[in-house]
């Protein structure tokens, strides 16, 4: 009972900053509370989530913020998902390269070969917390996001987009609220690895299928269908 009370108190204090500023709580964190704090050596997935949060904000606000560096990332693990609470520094080229502190919350879910990334929050840290952690976005899927999603790869060789929305110009399909992207790319299975057995495996072509949806509240979700990840084209 005492441990349960400590956990409730801990999560209550985490919620006060919406999961972002928790480093002062980590020394007293109960062992049963699965929250990880990181301020260096971020992996590829953290960078992907940071870029995705900035991407949503740019398309919503009409800005062109660019990732400069990541300050910290808190990740909360549950039985069904991982929530990333990322504080980063973004550069604003339109303001002479000035730097702004940015926060984004991205949730990663994995359901039997279907992986989803959902952006619940994307904002400047100086902005007041919204009543709900959901914001609208008129977003496209930028090439920087594509390049990170299919790591490790050398290059994207072709892309196609399907949407049921009434879009006249082909390039406008990238901005459709609901669309399916088919990306063919060159995959290097031994990139960054030491040779084993008979040596390196040759590069091969693969296909990535990414579905983007936005509900009536503007919640941005990317769904990755990995069932075709090993399909050779």
From Swiss-Prot:
InterPro entries: MS5. Transmembrane segments: none annotated. PANTHER family: BNAANNG28850D PROTEIN (PTHR31260:SF65), CYSTATIN/MONELLIN SUPERFAMILY PROTEIN (PTHR31260). Belongs to the UPF0725 (EMB2204) family. This is UPF0725 protein At4g17990. It comes from Arabidopsis thaliana.
């Amino acid at each position: 009972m005492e441990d349960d009370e400590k956990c409730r108190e801990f999560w209550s204090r985490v919620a006060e900053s919406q999961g972002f500023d928790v480093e002062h709580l980590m020394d007293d964190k109960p062992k049963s509370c699965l929250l990880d704090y990181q301020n260096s050596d971020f992996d590829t997935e953290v960078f992907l989530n940071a870029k995705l949060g900035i991407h949503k904000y740019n398309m919503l606000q009409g800005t062109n913020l660019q990732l400069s560096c990541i300050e910290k990332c808190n990740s909360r693990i549950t039985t069904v998902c991982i929530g990333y609470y990322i504080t980063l520094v973004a550069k604003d080229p339109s303001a002479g390269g000035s730097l702004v502190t940015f926060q984004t919350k991205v949730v990663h879910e994995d359901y039997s070969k279907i992986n989803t990334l959902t952006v619940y929050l994307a904002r400047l840290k100086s902005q007041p917390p919204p009543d709900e952690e959901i914001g609208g976005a008129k977003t496209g899927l930028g090439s920087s996001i594509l390049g990170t999603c299919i790591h490790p790869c050398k290059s994207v060789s072709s892309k196609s987009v399907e949407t049921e929305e009434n879009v006249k110009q082909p390039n406008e399909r990238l901005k459709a609220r609901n669309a399916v992207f088919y990306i063919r790319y060159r995959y290097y299975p031994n990139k960054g690895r030491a040779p084993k057995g008979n040596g390196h495996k040759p590069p091969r072509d693969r296909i990535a299928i990414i579905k983007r949806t936005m509900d009536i509240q503007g919640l941005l979700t990317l769904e990755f269908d990995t069932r075709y990840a090993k399909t050779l084209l």
